[in-house]
Amino acid sequence: MDRLNDNAGNFKRNSNAIIGANFETSTPSQAQILTKNWIENLNYRLELCKNDDEKLLEILNSHIEFERIHPFSDGNGRTGRLIMMYLCFQEKITPFVIEKEDIALYMSYLREQNVDIIFEKVKELQKFEQKRIDKF
């Protein structure tokens, strides 16, 4: 139980940063309200989507926004990827997994905020996952 964060599960109390990022994350005083607004906006935008590709683009855009808010002291990346998985299930679109060996590339895409490149990569990942799903 070494190195446990005493703030686990709560909004950050101290400023944090993403190594290699070219932007600042939200301040501790902004984190909770920005996260609340993020959730409300995400749900609204998902309701407006007309097809699975629009839903996926919205999920990816919202993921970039979440990572920029960076509301927790630790675990924002894992939490953000888990939220994307949850949203895929919620919206009944094929989920995808970002493998360990792809994390550096994924991080560079996030830094660039290039949702089109992320979208193309995720479409490939979805095809792979769909093949695995179809085996069952």
Located regions from the model:
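FIC/Doc superfamily catalytic core
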Residues: M1-F136
